[in-house]
Amino acid sequence: MNVVQGNIESKNAKIAIVVSRFNSFVVESLLDGAVDTLKRFGQVADDNITVIKVPGAVELPLAARRVAASGKFDGIISLGAVIRGGTPHFDLVAGECNKGLAQVALEYDIPVSFGVLTTDTIEQAIERSGTKAGNKGGEAALGLLEMVNVLQALEEQL
């Protein structure tokens, strides 16, 4: 039996982090967690990490698509925070963002990690950006590092 899996060390990986500025008080903590994870666990060099900031979560897929189309990166981390309000806007933004990012991954055959919080309250978002519930930015980075290595291993074996 042949098992293909990836580890998290990716010293030479070139990683783009596409970040929504909306709800920046939460998203900046997600970014800190992602960068810390890339450096500490992935051993990714500063020069191999590019941060791209966009206005909001709806803009994440387009920026990720442009990054993927460049062919210069091994993976993309998307970070944002969509917090439910009193209108259906939350469902539209969260759904389109998720769908668009998944489409980029499939269209360009590049790992796109989803680190966009979709929470009911500000408190839940804060908890998931580095307090009680860990840092989902760091978790998104871990998943991305593993997928970069899985895809490289598949390329070598197939």
Curated annotation (Swiss-Prot):
It comes from the Bacteria. The active site is at residue 89. InterPro entries: LS, LS/RS, LS/RS_sf. (2S)-2-hydroxy-3-oxobutyl phosphate binds at residues 86-87, 128. Its EC number is 2.5.1.78. One of its GO terms (biological process) is riboflavin biosynthetic process. One of its GO terms (molecular function) is 6,7-dimethyl-8-ribityllumazine synthase activity. It catalyses: (2S)-2-hydroxy-3-oxobutyl phosphate + 5-amino-6-(D-ribitylamino)uracil = 6,7-dimethyl-8-(1-D-ribityl)lumazine + phosphate + 2 H2O + H(+). Keywords: Riboflavin biosynthesis, Transferase. GO terms for cellular component: cytosol; riboflavin synthase complex. Gene3D superfamilies: Lumazine/riboflavin synthase. 5-amino-6-(D-ribitylamino)uracil binds at residues 22, 57-59, 81-83, 114. Pathway: Cofactor biosynthesis; riboflavin biosynthesis; riboflavin from 2-hydroxy-3-oxobutyl phosphate and 5-amino-6-(D-ribitylamino)uracil: step 1/2. The keyword Transferase applies. Pfam families: DMRL_synthase. It is an enzyme of class 2 (transferase). Forms an icosahedral capsid composed of 60 subunits, arranged as a dodecamer of pentamers. Belongs to the DMRL synthase family. Catalyzes the formation of 6,7-dimethyl-8-ribityllumazine by condensation of 5-amino-6-(D-ribitylamino)uracil with 3,4-dihydroxy-2-butanone 4-phosphate. This is the penultimate step in the biosynthesis of riboflavin. This is 6,7-dimethyl-8-ribityllumazine synthase. The gene is ribH.
